[in-house]
């Protein structure tokens, strides 16, 4: 929507920013405050619009020159017959003089050739002229005249530009490409939503404040509705809750479709993952959960699409209060007002004044939060040594396994009273946690160059995790938050004491239609190159950013050599796979290759690829492999809903996936036994760590950074399972040494053969 439209809307007296009260709701703004807030929002909006009109400089390094089509034919020798053969040495001098002329460079710049493109075009043109046996008659005659002193060197320019446009076809259509990649008004992409006046209701509050409860209550009351959540687990929860309440509801995720009606007739209510929601189906009520993820660098585009595009009379968004101002600002561009409901936490949580410091101090209802699998393995093992049972939850586990572990932890009759988890517990699972214990406050990540970085968790992340302590519907009405290490506690208090950074922009992503239009103009470009050029040419409003497309490009480059049509290639590249898993990537490549042969990917074919049937895991590496196989089966199911004819056996795949999930659950239930089974043979590794948790986070942090940098340099020479686990990053040297020491002690106590721990040889 244009700024003029905003001015018109603001001039209408009924436009206002309303803050309504609800059960446990907070403040109500006065009229003067509302007008001031509206005026401030409009000032910011006008500034963003005025600053977004100019396009960014074109990154010409993305333009890859195409090979020149030679047009030698019977007419090729006409030029030589009319004049005389060209002297190559003289011709080279003429071409070099042409290249050095500032006037030609300026003229080429006006035609879209910057210094980089001008140089590349000239090198190609010079090679073409010097190596062709016979040139076109007109070019041959012009060059001959210049060599003889009868022509001007500038006469070469039209032929040079003709050649430049052959190797850089985008020069002829750059204006069209800019129009296609203009992302400044994404609201206009959804005409169905713009055709109605929608009511936007923002339910703002922290974790466990009841904000989603009130939105879902309205969803269940409506004649039709759609729930859009960030996780399959959340979509499943709403699907089950809705049907249990007597409201027929279908489930739609990337890998699954469940229709309540036995004949497959769609229900009035749908629970879906955010990427799968329909922006053309009309609804009475739509719920968008975790709206703060609109700023997510990779998935933010899905929340933007849902917020701008859902065709519903009421849009209920749930999320952090830090997103209220931005969502209000964004909705001004569509002429829709925002009604804000502020919620307070139903059960309080407090920050402890003491760190746990030792696993001996654990109590029932404790959840230790780690940010790496290695820490989960280590702590799980140490908890078992103390005679306690623990549940384990981390991101790469299948949803069924996560639910089983959550159920085990929540069951008051189960002896398992401790949970060890990653930040995967931040959303999607209902857990009866009394105390959240941060094992660390730093998280490892990869930057754009693929290098490991260590960052302290943000206030938003810390609050999301800490908010899981104490729950209104659980036995623990009050929650507590602390750290494992004493040095971390003041840092945690500082993090939780800071205000959450307000959201500034929303994510966008190029659509398949936009990429197809690009490909029409640039038929020889690869998909990865098309995406790069699109992002380079794209223009966005100050309210938006283009999401990270590195994963998309990674998959595009992986299957570039496989012959696929553009639409199929695009769909394959949007598949949600973990590129860090080699087995998953290899399977993805096999899927694409089989698809390109127009051969259906049958159940038997898939079983051969994954070596089905698979046994329960005997060690950690087996467990990791089973998780990867589960991801491959998920990939098959995801593709089966996009290419039904080519992936025909989804029901059979789903059956073996359930069996695989059970095997993974067996492995997770016995995770400490799998750790003990890592290697029964001693290795030349120095035993220098104890079974107690180190007190100093500073030394721990330094040690982890050094391990990540030097891990490959210090691998044991022995080609054992332990060395392979170390090489794959599934196990640290310190953890291996510690485990070997513990196994030796246990075997000595049982009067078994002792394990001799050797010392690492000094270099």
From Swiss-Prot:
It is an enzyme of class 3 (hydrolase). ATP binds at residues 205-212. Residues 1-65 form a transit peptide. Residues 39-58, 679-721, 742-763 are annotated as: Disordered. GO terms for biological process: DNA recombination; liver development; mitochondrial mRNA catabolic process; mitochondrial mRNA surveillance; mitochondrial ncRNA surveillance; mitochondrial RNA 3'-end processing; mitochondrial RNA surveillance; mitochondrion organization. Pfam families: DEXQc_Suv3, Helicase_C, SUV3_C, Suv3_C_1, Suv3_N. Residues 354-519 form the Helicase C-terminal domain. PROSITE patterns: HELICASE_ATP_BIND_1, HELICASE_CTER. Residues 680-697 have a biased composition (Polar residues). GO terms for molecular function: 3'-5' RNA helicase activity; ATP binding; ATP hydrolysis activity; DNA binding; DNA helicase activity; double-stranded RNA binding; RNA helicase activity. This is ATP-dependent RNA helicase SUPV3L1, mitochondrial. It comes from Danio rerio. The gene is supv3l1.
């Amino acid at each position: 929507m244009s700024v003029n439209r905003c001015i018109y809307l603001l001039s209408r007296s009924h436009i206002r920013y309303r803050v309504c009260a609800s059960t446990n709701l907070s403040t109500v703004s006065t009229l003067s405050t509302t007008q001031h807030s509206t005026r401030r929002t409009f000032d910011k909006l006008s500034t963003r619009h005025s600053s977004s009109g100019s396009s960014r400089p074109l990154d010409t390094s993305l333009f890859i020159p195409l090979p020149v089509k030679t047009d030698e034919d019977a007419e090729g020798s006409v030029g030589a017959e009319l004049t005389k053969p060209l002297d190559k040495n003289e011709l080279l001098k003429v071409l070099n003089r042409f290249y050095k002329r500032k006037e030609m460079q300026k003229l080429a710049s006006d035609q879209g050739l910057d210094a980089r493109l001008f140089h590349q075009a000239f090198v190609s043109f010079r090679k073409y002229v010097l190596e062709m046996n016979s040139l076109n008659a007109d070019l041959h005659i012009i060059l001959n005249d210049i060599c003889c002193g009868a022509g001007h060197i500038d006469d070469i320019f039209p032929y040079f530009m003709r050649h430049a446009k052959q190797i850089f076809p985008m020069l002829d259509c750059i204006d069209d490409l800019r129009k296609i990649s203009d992302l400044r008004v994404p609201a206009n992409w959804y005409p169905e939503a713009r055709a109605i006046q929608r009511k936007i209701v923002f339910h703002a509050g922290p974790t466990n404040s009841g904000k989603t409860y009130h939105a879902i209550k309205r969803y269940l009351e409506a004649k039709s509705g759609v729930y859009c959540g960030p996780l399959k687990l959340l979509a499943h929860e709403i699907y089950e809750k809705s049907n249990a309440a007597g409201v027929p509801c279908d489930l739609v995720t990337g890998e699954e479709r469940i229709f309540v009606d036995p004949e497959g007739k769609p229900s009035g209510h749908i629970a879906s993952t955010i990427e799968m929601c329909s922006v053309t189906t009309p609804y009475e009520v739509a719920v968008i959960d975790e709206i703060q993820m609109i700023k997510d660098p990779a998935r933010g585009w899905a929340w933007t699409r849902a917020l701008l595009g859902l065709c519903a009379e009421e849009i209920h968004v749930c999320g952090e209060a830090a997103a209220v101002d931005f969502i209000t600002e964004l909705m001004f561009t569509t002429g829709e007002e925002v009604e804000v409901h502020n919620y307070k936490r139903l059960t309080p949580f407090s920050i402890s004044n003491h760190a746990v410091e030792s696993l001996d101090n654990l109590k029932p209802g404790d959840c230790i939060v780690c940010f790496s699998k290695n820490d989960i393995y280590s702590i799980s093992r140490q908890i078992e040594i103390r005679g306690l049972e623990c549940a384990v939850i981390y991101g790469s586990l299948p949803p069924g396994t996560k639910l089983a572990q959550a159920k085990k932890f929540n069951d008051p009759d189960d002896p398992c009273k401790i949970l060890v988890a990653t930040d995967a517990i931040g959303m999607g699972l209902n857990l009866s946690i009394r105390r959240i214990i941060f094992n660390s406050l730093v998280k490892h990540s990869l930057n754009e160059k693929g290098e490991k970085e260590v960052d302290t968790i943000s206030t938003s992340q810390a609050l999301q995790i800490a908010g899981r302590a104490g729950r209104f519907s659980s036995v623990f009405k009050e929650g507590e938050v602390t750290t494992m290490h004493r040095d971390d506690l003041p840092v945690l208090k500082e993090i939780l004491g800071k205000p959450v950074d307000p959201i500034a922009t929303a994510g966008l992503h190029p659509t398949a239609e936009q990429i197809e239009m690009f490909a029409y103009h640039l038929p020889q470009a690869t998909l990865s190159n098309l995406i790069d050029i699109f992002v380079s040419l794209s223009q966005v409003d100050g309210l938006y950013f283009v999401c990270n497309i590195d994963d998309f490009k990674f998959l595009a480059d992986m299957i570039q050599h496989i012959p696929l049509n553009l639409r199929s290639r695009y769909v394959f590249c949007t598949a949600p796979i973990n590129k860090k898993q080699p087995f998953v990537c290899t399977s993805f490549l096999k899927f694409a290759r089989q698809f390109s042969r127009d051969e259906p990917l049958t159940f038997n074919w898939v079983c051969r690829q994954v070596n089905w049937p698979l046994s329960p895991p005997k060690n950690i590496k087996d467990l990791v492999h089973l998780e990867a196989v589960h991801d491959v089966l998920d990939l098959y199911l995801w593709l089966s809903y996009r290419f039904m004819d080519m992936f025909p056996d989804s029901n059979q795949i789903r059956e073996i996936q359930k069996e695989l999930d059970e095997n993974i659950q067996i492995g997770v239930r016995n995770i400490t036994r799998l750790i003990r089974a890592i290697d029964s043979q001693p290795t030349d590794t120095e035993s220098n760590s104890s079974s107690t948790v180190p007190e100093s986070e500073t030394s721990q942090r330094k040690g982890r950074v050094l391990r990540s940098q030097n891990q490959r340099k210090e691998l044991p020479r022995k080609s054992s399972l332990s060395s392979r686990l170390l090489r794959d990053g599934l196990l640290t040297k310190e953890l291996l040494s510690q485990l070997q020491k513990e196994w030796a002690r246990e075997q000595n106590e049982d009067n078994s053969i002792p394990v001799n721990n050797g010392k690492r040889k000094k270099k």
